[in-house]
Amino acid sequence: MSKINHQPSEAELEILQILWDDQPLTVREIHEIISQTKNVGYTTVLKQMQRMEAEKGLLIRYKEGKVHYYSAAIQKSDVQTSSLNRFVNAVFNGSTSDLIMHALGNQTTSKEELEELEKWLKEQKGKL
């Protein structure tokens, strides 16, 4: 797992999610996808992506002819792990069990989900 040096903002995560689903893409393609759900200008998306590439190292850009393509420079799983660790540390004082119990206590958990969780716990115990 690589170390995430910059925790992506909500807007950056939106762009990364699009790229993780289908990359490489151009700014225009990403703008078209984002524009389906919110009113944002092309130049806003362009500037955001330029900063993500040049300043934050979140994107990789390459040129093919006159077209610039972008790909995510970080793995989705690395961002998920980093974000979850920060959340658990900040909100649950580092306690993963508190997080899980809180999540299960606030949701309607199906029998299948509980069985999956039991299976996962047994696998984790076997790794100790």
What function would you assign to each model-found segment?
Residues 46-50:
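Short, hydrophobic-biased segments on the C-terminal half of alpha helices
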Residues 54-64:
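Beta-hairpin "wing" of winged helix-turn-helix
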Residues 25-33:
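Short acidic, hydrophobic short linear motifs in intrinsically disordered regions
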Residues 82-125:
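Amphipathic alpha-helical dimerization/coiled-coil segments
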Residues 32-40:
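Short helix-coil junctions and helix-kink-helix linkers
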